[in-house]
Amino acid sequence: MGGCMSTPEAPKKTAETKQVPSTSTSSRPPQASTSATATAAGAGTSAANGTANGIKGDTTATNRVGTSGGQGLAAALASTEPPGAQDSKGNKDRSNQIDRQLEDDQKKFRKECKILLLGSGESGKSTIVKQMKIIHQNGYSKDELLSFRGVIYKNVLDSAQALIMAMRKIGVDPEDANNRSYADRILEYRMDAGLDAVIPSEILYNIESLWHDPVIPSVMDRSSEFYLMDSATYFFANIRKIAGPDYVPDEADVLRARTKTTGISETRFNMGQLSIHMFDVGGQRSERKKWIHCFEAVTSIIFCVALSEYDQVLLEESGQNRMQESLVLFESVINSRWFLRTSVILFLNKIDLFKQKLPKVPLVQYFPEYTGGADINKAAKYILWRFTQTNRARLSVYPHLTQATDTSNIRLVFAAVKETILQNALRDSGIL
């Protein structure tokens, strides 16, 4: 695979888009004093550098094909004897041969690349797929946006009911008497099935009132004790828009809409000269047995990890820490015999939520070995180190900090990812 470097001293910025793979297996944690992981803002800046690198990669590839053909043409001309020494047929044959070689190289280069999206449940895989539609497939039509309305209503209701049940579990009631009755009403409400289902505006306004109850901040401080989807706070904050009679979700809403991925879905799009087939598979345990069908001839894996999940438990097993589950899954993927020639692009996702949570919920409570306090760079670098420790197969790993719900961030990061995929495609095609 590609060149190697030691991750504990590793990429000076996790999101830096210089395509230097990380393959370290050092057993020592990174030094807390080293700031080697970019912040969310750094992710965007360094990804911009990757854009230049990606363009450079494309230019290099083009020059490689063009130069080899040009050298062949020069050699053919240099060997041509003075006029009249040969018949024109020989020159034409040589020219045709050069043209055929150039055409063959271009056909090799235009190969289809398979990318497999892996990661535990709710790590951001499906959000990445939605971003590819927005960035590379002209986004969503109005009808497509409307198709998410029922999903968003269900997300809002499920989140409100989960919050109320959590309040009762920890023994907290709303301070406002009206909100106490609203909580009962919300908990009893059952939404109709189907994409066209709606929630009465009265229920939505009850949810808004409950969300603004004075007791809610103290409940949210204990969010590691119960399950609440990441987008809950976003939808609660936008409840008035959602409650409108003519509500049409926008792309920001769609990116945060949550549905469980079942089976395998494929998205096709072009990135420059590359034709990409991206496979999104279910992240829940029950879905992982289906992944095997996607493993053959994969160019790259994008493995998504939610940085903010370090204090959260699995949806399907409340006693299992999500970050530990992701580590186990990553270890099984990166050391699998299916991926011996595959590069792994590691998305350390949800950097925005991680930055908000870290000062309130110390990472050391869940990883006693960590010594970096509330420093976002040190914390992200430590988590990266934990993942690279599992890389016994010493595959090339390309880490990036991401915020999957931010289209501008993903656009810039994928400019860098393109270079990685491009180099693998060129290598596999025999051009490199």
Curated annotation (Swiss-Prot):
Q: Where is this region: G1 motif?
A: 114-127
Q: Where is the G-alpha domain?
A: 111-432
Q: Tell me which GO cellular component terms the UniProt record holds.
A: cytoplasm; heterotrimeric G-protein complex
Compositional bias (Low complexity) spans?
21-52
Start and end residues of each stretch annotated as G5 motif: 402-407
Start and end residues of each stretch annotated as G3 motif? 276-285
- Binding of GTP occurs at E122, S123, G124, K125, S126, T127, D230, L255, T261, G283, N349, K350, D352, A404
Q: What residue spans carry the region label Disordered?
A: 1-97
Q: Does the keyword GTP-binding apply?
A: yes
Q: Which example biological process does GO assign this protein?
A: adenylate cyclase-activating G protein-coupled receptor signaling pathway
| Lipid modification (S-palmitoyl cysteine), residues | C4
Do you know which SMART domains this protein is assigned to?
G_alpha
Locate the residues binding Mg(2+): S126, T261
What the entry lists under Pfam families is as follows:
G-alpha
The record, for InterPro entries, names: Fungi_Gprotein_alpha (IPR002975), Gprotein_alpha_su (IPR001019), GproteinA_insert (IPR011025), P-loop_NTPase (IPR027417)
Question: PANTHER family, alphabetically?
Answer: GTP-BINDING PROTEIN ALPHA SUBUNIT, GUANINE NUCLEOTIDE-BINDING PROTEIN ALPHA-2 SUBUNIT
Listed name of the protein: Guanine nucleotide-binding protein subunit alpha
